[in-house]
């Protein structure tokens, strides 16, 4: 029978539940157990697909095309599992489903209430994931903070699950913050109150994960255990660490993995975390620093590009390179020009995005990389920007643009996909999820992947306009990846360049620690080689003494 672990948060938001859940999943998987994960988000949006990145951060796209919370990216990277749309549930989805059933008459004229109808729908979604995944353990993170009014139906649903599946098949983990005051003393009172608030909705925490910026001694653990009525072994200190990939080892060294297995009666094998320990050891080693510019629209909020950031670090780690990300606002490039902002970097990355703001800065960055031989990686919109830049400055064609930014442009080298023309709703209507791409032999993309066909995740409405394909190819643009039906250009590149590759898809969503994505691996390697070549040119000549 599937076991369930429910993870709640207290004291403050953004306390680290997502990394905690991902780390717990890693500990269980290292013991030979199959794990699936779910995020319950209490907002009324159906999904984050139409939310501003400033509000929500990155939209993570699953293989089956769901637009989900960025925490699903952490889950996939830590546990090395591909999740589905079943793994992200919002209040908006729950209420939409219940109201649709009421309109169909499924409730036979009954009065629709939060209890039981909303809570039953929540439990049904959790059960669907368990049945679909057939996982030994399903870990469910409840978004928000205990005490938020939006979270109450979810808390009530997971309270009811204790009776539905049996007390021995459930664990409740509460993640809290231990703040410290000017004297340096860690304060436990907020955690005590948070545990009490959880009890007020009928849930008693089995395990307390205590976040803090400084060490938590045994006296504090015993105090929390006393007030929370848990075993002192169940009070787990989680100090702030240099890398999120250290967290599974912190939890393992505190005995959490064995404690979970013991409490849930899981048929686990001894933990195998040797590869993970080797990964963390590589993270701690001194590495050559390579500056890479990320030119984007939302650079003030790094979480808007979290999968891109992690994919860069995965590739750097494999090659003993410390990626020094230079966050460059595309609007700044428009105002000040690319030369001043990009002259000190050895790689330029333009990630995905939407909207006209900053677009000319992204196009200028793509062209600057082309002219100056700086390795370039374009993702989704970054590929479209590279195409526009090439058409403008290599072909010398005037009034070139995407119809997203100028519907009346004379030369729409990027245009709305035909099947998008009659769509009026924004949410969930793009080309989303995993699609195949055929790679052209003899190209950088083919060499990077080492195969003829790949499958990658997409999120876009606009595409390369095939009306311009022949003229662009004649001018030197290489189409190195294309859909099997030959209609959609997936990858473009340049031949006589250290690395100039751009994809319509989002390779960052499939990068993993220890298994970097091939395009990021190639990009980072080219950036490092460019740095080394530059250093070699600057070395002083040494006269021979012979």
Curated annotation (Swiss-Prot):
InterPro entries: Class_I_gatase-like, CTP_synthase, CTP_synthase_N, GATASE, GATase1_CTP_Synthase, P-loop_NTPase
Domain Glutamine amidotransferase type-1 residues, every copy: 291-533
Keywords per UniProt: ATP-binding, Glutamine amidotransferase, Ligase, Magnesium, Metal-binding, Nucleotide-binding, Pyrimidine biosynthesis
Residues annotated as binding Mg(2+): 71, 141
BP-aspect Gene Ontology terms: 'de novo' CTP biosynthetic process; CTP biosynthetic process; pyrimidine nucleobase biosynthetic process
Active-site residues, record numbering mapped to chain: 380 (nucleophile), 506, 508
Activity control mechanisms: Allosterically activated by GTP, when glutamine is the substrate; GTP has no effect on the reaction when ammonia is the substrate. The allosteric effector GTP functions by stabilizing the protein conformation that binds the tetrahedral intermediate(s) formed during glutamine hydrolysis. Inhibited by the product CTP, via allosteric rather than competitive inhibition.
Residue segments, region Amidoligase domain: 1-266
Keyword ATP-binding: yes
Catalyzed chemical reaction(s): UTP + L-glutamine + ATP + H2O = CTP + L-glutamate + ADP + phosphate + 2 H(+); L-glutamine + H2O = L-glutamate + NH4(+); UTP + NH4(+) + ATP = CTP + ADP + phosphate + 2 H(+)
Residues at which UTP binds: 13, 187-192, 223
GO molecular function: ATP binding; CTP synthase activity; glutaminase activity; identical protein binding; metal ion binding
Pfam families: CTP_synth_N, GATase
Binding site for L-glutamine: 54, 353, 381-384, 404, 461
Cellular component GO terms held in the UniProt record: cytosol
Superkingdom per UniProt: Bacteria
Residues the entry annotates as binding CTP: 13, 148-150, 187-192, 223
Pathway note: Pyrimidine metabolism; CTP biosynthesis via de novo pathway; CTP from UDP: step 2/2
Keyword Membrane attributed: no
E.C. code: 6.3.4.2
Residues annotated as binding ATP: 14-19, 71
Subunit structure comment from the entry: Homotetramer.
Entry's family note: Belongs to the CTP synthase family.
Note from the entry: CTPSs have evolved a hybrid strategy for distinguishing between UTP and CTP. The overlapping regions of the product feedback inhibitory and substrate sites recognize a common feature in both compounds, the triphosphate moiety. To differentiate isosteric substrate and product pyrimidine rings, an additional pocket far from the expected kinase/ligase catalytic site, specifically recognizes the cytosine and ribose portions of the product inhibitor.
Function: Catalyzes the ATP-dependent amination of UTP to CTP with either L-glutamine or ammonia as the source of nitrogen. Regulates intracellular CTP levels through interactions with the four ribonucleotide triphosphates.
Name listed for the protein in its UniProt record: CTP synthase
UniProt organism field: Chloroflexus aurantiacus (strain ATCC 29366 / DSM 635 / J-10-fl)
Lineage: Bacteria, Bacillati, Chloroflexota, Chloroflexia, Chloroflexales
Gene: pyrG
């Amino acid at each position: 029978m599937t076991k369930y672990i429910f993870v709640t948060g207290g004291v403050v938001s953004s306390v680290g539940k997502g990394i905690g859940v991902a780390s717990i999943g890693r500990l269980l998987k290292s013991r030979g157990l199959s794990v699936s994960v779910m995020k319950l988000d209490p907002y009324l949006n159906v999904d984050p697909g139409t939310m501003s990145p400033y509000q929500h951060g990155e939209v993570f796209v699953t293989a089956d095309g769901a637009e989900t919370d960025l925490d699903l990216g952490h889950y996939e990277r830590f546990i090395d599992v591909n999740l589905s749309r079943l793994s992200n549930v919002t209040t908006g989805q729950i209420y939409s489903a219940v109201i649709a059933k009421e309109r169909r008459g499924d409730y036979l004229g009954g009065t629709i209430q939060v209890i039981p109808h909303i809570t039953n729908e929540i439990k049904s979604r959790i059960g669907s994931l368990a049945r679909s995944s057939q996982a030994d353990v399903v870990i469910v993170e409840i978004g928000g903070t205990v005490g938020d009014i939006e979270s109450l139906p979810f808390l009530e649903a997971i309270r009811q699950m204790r009776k539905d599946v049996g007390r021995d098949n459930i664990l409740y983990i509460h993640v809290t913050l231990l703040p410290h005051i000017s004297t340096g003393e860690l304060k436990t009172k907020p955690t005590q109150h948070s545990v009490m608030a959880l009890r007020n909705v009928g849930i008693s925490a089995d395990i307390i994960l205590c976040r803090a910026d400084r060490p938590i001694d045994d006296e504090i653990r015993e105090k929390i255990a006393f007030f929370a009525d848990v075993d002192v072994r169940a009070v787990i200190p989680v100090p702030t660490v240099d890398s999120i990939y250290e967290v599974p080892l912190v939890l393992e060294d505190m005995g959490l993995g064995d404690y979970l297995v013991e409490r849930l009666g899981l048929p686990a094998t001894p933990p195998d975390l040797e590869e993970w320990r080797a990964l963390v050891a590589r993270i701690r080693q001194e590495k050559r620093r390579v500056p890479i510019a990320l030119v984007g629209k939302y650079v003030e909020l790094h979480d808007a590009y979290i999968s891109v950031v992690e994919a860069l670090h995965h590739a750097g780690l494999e090659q003993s390179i410390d990626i020094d990300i230079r966050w460059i606002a595309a609007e700044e490039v428009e105002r000040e020009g690319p030369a001043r902002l990009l002259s000190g970097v050895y790689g330029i990355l333009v990630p995905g995005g939407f909207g006209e703001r900053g677009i000319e800065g992204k196009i200028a960055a793509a062209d600057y990389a082309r002219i100056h031989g700086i390795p370039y990686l374009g993702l989704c919109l970054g590929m479209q920007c590279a195409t526009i830049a090439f058409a403008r400055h290599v072909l010398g064609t005037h009034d070139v643009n995407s119809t997203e930014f100028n519907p009346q442009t004379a030369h729409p080298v990027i245009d709305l996909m035909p099947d998008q023309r009659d769509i009026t709703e924004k949410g969930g209507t793009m080309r989303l999820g995993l699609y195949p791409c055929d790679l052209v032999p003899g190209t950088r993309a083919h060499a990077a992947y080492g195969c003829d066909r790949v499958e990658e995740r997409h999120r876009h409405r606009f595409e390369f306009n095939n009306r311009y394909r022949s003229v662009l190819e004649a001018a030197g643009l290489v189409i190195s990846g294309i859909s099997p039906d030959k209609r959609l250009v997936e990858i473009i590149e340049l031949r006589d360049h250290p690395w100039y590759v751009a994809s319509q898809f989002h390779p960052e969503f499939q990068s993993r620690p220890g298994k970097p994505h091939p395009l990021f691996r190639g990009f980072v390697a080219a950036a490092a080689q460019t740095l080394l070549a530059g250093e070699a040119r600057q070395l002083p000549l040494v006269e021979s003494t012979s």
